[in-house]
């Protein structure tokens, strides 16, 4: 478990008022901020800090930004979309998924229609 502390009293003056993250499982201390003697992100053994008194400092985990994939599933044939480009009057209700939204294929511009056709169909994975 990781605990945030501010050192309030220590034999080593460089530790006074410094802020650390203590990892009790690894027996490590990571310097968050110190006026002198330690660099930010420097990792030392908790034992290397010597005797000290501290107060707990609340820490908040940064949100994880995870990448991801977005998948739109359109179940139809390439020929159907190509025919809809050539004969839009035959497909007034043709609806596809684009960026998670349902849209009428005929409401897209010609460039958007070509892009959908190019991205929707692949020869292999």
Swiss-Prot record:
PROSITE patterns: GLY_RADICAL_1, GLY_RADICAL_2. Acts as a radical domain for damaged PFL and possibly other radical proteins. The modification Glycine radical is found at residue 100. The keyword RNA-binding does not apply. This is Autonomous glycyl radical cofactor. The keyword Cell membrane does not apply. It comes from the Bacteria. Keywords: Organic radical. GO terms for cellular component: cytosol. One of its GO terms (molecular function) is formate C-acetyltransferase activity. NCBIfam families: spare_glycyl (TIGR04365). Residues 5-125 form the Glycine radical domain. It comes from Vibrio cholerae serotype O1 (strain ATCC 39541 / Classical Ogawa 395 / O395). InterPro entries: Auton_GlycylRad_Cofactor, Form_AcTrfase_GR_CS, Gly_radical, Glycyl_radical_cofactor_GrcA.
């Amino acid at each position: 478990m990781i605990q945030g502390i501010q050192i309030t009293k220590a034999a080593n003056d460089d530790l006074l008022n410094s802020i650390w993250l203590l990892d009790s499982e690894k027996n490590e201390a990571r310097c968050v901020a110190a006026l002198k003697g330690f660099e930010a992100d420097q990792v030392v053994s908790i034992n290397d800090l010597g005797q000290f008194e501290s107060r707990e400092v609340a820490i908040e985990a940064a949100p994880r930004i995870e990448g991801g994939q977005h998948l739109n599933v359109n179940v139809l044939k390439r020929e159907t979309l190509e025919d809809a480009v050539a004969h839009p009057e035959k497909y007034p209700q043709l609806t596809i998924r684009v960026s998670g939204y349902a849209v009428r294929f005929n409401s897209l511009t010609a460039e958007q229609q070509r892009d959908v056709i190019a991205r929707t169909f692949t020869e292999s994975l």
